[in-house]
């Protein structure tokens, strides 16, 4: 049986008390947030965001401030959506018993501070020197008093001191407590009215409830969305039927023909007009650099060069630059062959000339393969053949008087069973010897 003194509904006095306190000591954001919690017992954070239209960071700052002052409490609940996903939500509510205790504590703390300030601000005389700005209290009056003149003079500059008006207490300092009690009297009256109120646990720790205004707006939005879906369903179905097919979206057909590449590119090249060659390719930029005598001394095969140039497309018959490069190449090759074949001593001057010519030819001519490369290639092939022959040697093992290769016997265990004891010992000894040779 429920206690008749326990209230199952929040009294109006408690709601007015919360409104008075929040409007007297907090800003407008805190007032709006607490008004929602006064009208609704327990509100989710997302619902408060939708009602107040605050930024999430701003709303959390306001709620954390109220929660730090013990005006509201927070409860976290884990909810499971229709798709099975769990989410955490914060629910805020007002614990009115804690609210009353916090208001009493803060008001008492303010009253005690005012009394302390009033007690400390007694009317004690204070003196100040107008020249050196030294200050003195009433306890130092015996040091300041001059019996000859009957005035108070500074102990440093002997100037007559004046009473410090800035150190005087405020005119309303003694009436501050009376003004405080007068202004806070409505809150005191509400506290006396709610002194013996006993609230039920369902009021102190309420369960989450749905806000009617938000529920109606959600229902209207769902109804409008359903009506729009029914009205536009036919059009969407027709649009989807007319849409393209994406079955072959990732299907690509690529044909690679390596034999007929020239035939494929020839029509495109034939359709384009041949570009005119620049003058520095048609005519030599070096006039008279090399004469016919130098070409003869260099041993250049002019006929071979001309045949090669005629085979190429375009007017490259009289390219002096290519001839100069060939002259350098032939000169370098002839000097190298003559020095190696004749083994004749060469002076330092000739050596310097040949080095300069070689450096110039290396800069201008393309690299040439070495003459000793083919013998080296044959030697590598001979070494590979010898290694192959060494690896190919397979020892012979006797099985019942018949010769078999060692690898064949290793792959066929039934041959081992046909061996005589002497043949088996020879087979085992050969395997051990091959194993030792392998790791030496």
Curated annotation (Swiss-Prot):
GO terms for molecular function: RNA polymerase II general transcription initiation factor activity; zinc ion binding. InterPro entries: TFE, TFIIE/TFIIEa_HTH, TFIIE_asu, TFIIE_asu_C, TFIIEa/SarR/Rpc3_HTH_dom, Znf_RING/FYVE/PHD, Znf_TFIIB. One of its GO terms (biological process) is transcription initiation at RNA polymerase II promoter. Residues 333-395 are annotated as: Disordered. A zinc finger (C4-type) spans 129-157. Residues 354-364, 381-393 have a biased composition (Acidic residues). Zn(2+) binds at residues 129, 132, 154, 157. Residues 14-104 form the HTH TFE/IIEalpha-type domain. Keywords: Acetylation, Metal-binding, Nucleus, Phosphoprotein, Transcription, Transcription regulation, Zinc, Zinc-finger. Gene3D superfamilies: 6.10.140.1250, Zinc/RING finger domain, C3HC4 (zinc finger). GO terms for cellular component: cytosol; transcription factor TFIID complex. SUPFAM superfamilies: Zinc beta-ribbon (SSF57783). The modification N6-acetyllysine is found at residue 67. The modification N-acetylalanine is found at residue 2. Residues 333-353 have a biased composition (Low complexity). It is found in: Nucleus. Pfam families: TFIIE-A_C (PF11521), TFIIE_alpha (PF02002), Zn_Ribbon_TF (PF08271). The modification Phosphoserine is found at residue 268. Recruits TFIIH to the initiation complex and stimulates the RNA polymerase II C-terminal domain kinase and DNA-dependent ATPase activities of TFIIH. Both TFIIH and TFIIE are required for promoter clearance by RNA polymerase. Tetramer of two alpha and two beta chains. Interacts with TAF6/TAFII80. Interacts with ATF7IP. Interacts with SND1. Part of TBP-based Pol II pre-initiation complex (PIC), in which Pol II core assembles with general transcription factors and other specific initiation factors including GTF2E1, GTF2E2, GTF2F1, GTF2F2, TCEA1, ERCC2, ERCC3, GTF2H2, GTF2H3, GTF2H4, GTF2H5, GTF2A1, GTF2A2, GTF2B and TBP; this large multi-subunit PIC complex mediates DNA unwinding and targets Pol II core to the transcription start site where the first phosphodiester bond forms. Belongs to the TFIIE alpha subunit family. This is General transcription factor IIE subunit 1. It comes from Mus musculus.
């Amino acid at each position: 049986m429920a206690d008749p003194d326990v209230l199952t509904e929040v009294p109006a006095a408690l709601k007015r008390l919360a409104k008075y306190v929040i409007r007297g000591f907090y800003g407008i954001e805190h007032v709006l947030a607490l008004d929602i919690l006064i009208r609704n017992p327990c509100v989710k954070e997302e619902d408060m965001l939708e009602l107040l239209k605050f930024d999430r960071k701003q709303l959390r700052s306001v709620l954390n401030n109220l929660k730090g002052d013990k005006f509201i409490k927070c409860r976290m609940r884990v909810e499971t959506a229709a798709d099975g996903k769990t989410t955490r939500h914060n629910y805020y509510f007002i614990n009115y018993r804690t609210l009353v205790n916090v208001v009493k504590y803060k008001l008492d703390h303010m009253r005690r501070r005012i009394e302390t300030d009033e007690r400390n601000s007694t009317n004690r005389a204070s003196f100040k020197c107008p020249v050196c700005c030294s200050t003195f209290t009433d306890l130092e009056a015996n040091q300041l008093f001059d019996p000859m003149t009957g005035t108070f003079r500074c102990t440093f500059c002997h100037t007559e001191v004046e009473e410090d008006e800035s150190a005087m207490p405020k005119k309303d300092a003694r009436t501050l407590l009376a003004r405080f009690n007068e202004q806070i009297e409505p809150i005191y009256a509400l506290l006396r009215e709610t002194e013996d109120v006993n609230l039920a646990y369902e009021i102190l720790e309420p369960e989450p409830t749905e806000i009617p205004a938000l529920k109606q707006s959600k229902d209207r939005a769902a109804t409008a969305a359903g009506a729009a879906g029914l009205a536009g369903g036919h059009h969407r179905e027709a649009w989807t039927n007319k849409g393209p097919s994406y079955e072959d979206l990732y299907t690509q057909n690529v044909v690679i023909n390596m034999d007929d590449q020239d035939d494929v590119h020839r029509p495109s090249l034939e359709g384009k007009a041949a570009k005119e060659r620049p003058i520095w390719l048609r005519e030599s930029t070096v006039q008279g650099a090399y004469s016919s005598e130098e070409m003869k001394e260099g041993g250049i095969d002019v006929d071979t060069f001309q045949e090669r140039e005629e085979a190429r497309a375009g007017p490259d018959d009289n390219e002096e630059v290519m001839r100069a490069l060939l002259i350098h190449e032939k000169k370098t090759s002839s000097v190298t062959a003559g020095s190696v074949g004749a083994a004749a001593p060469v002076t330092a001057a000739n050596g310097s000339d040949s080095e300069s010519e070689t450096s110039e030819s290396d800069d201008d001519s393309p690299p040439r393969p070495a003459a000793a490369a083919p013998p080296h290639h044959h030697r590598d092939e001979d070494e590979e053949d010898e290694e192959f022959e060494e690896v190919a040697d397979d020892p012979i093992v006797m099985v019942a008087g018949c010769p078999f290769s060692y690898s064949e016997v290793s792959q066929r265990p039934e041959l081992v069973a046909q061996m005589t004891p002497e043949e088996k010992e020879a087979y085992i000894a050969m395997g051990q010897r091959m194993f030792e040779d392998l790791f030496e």
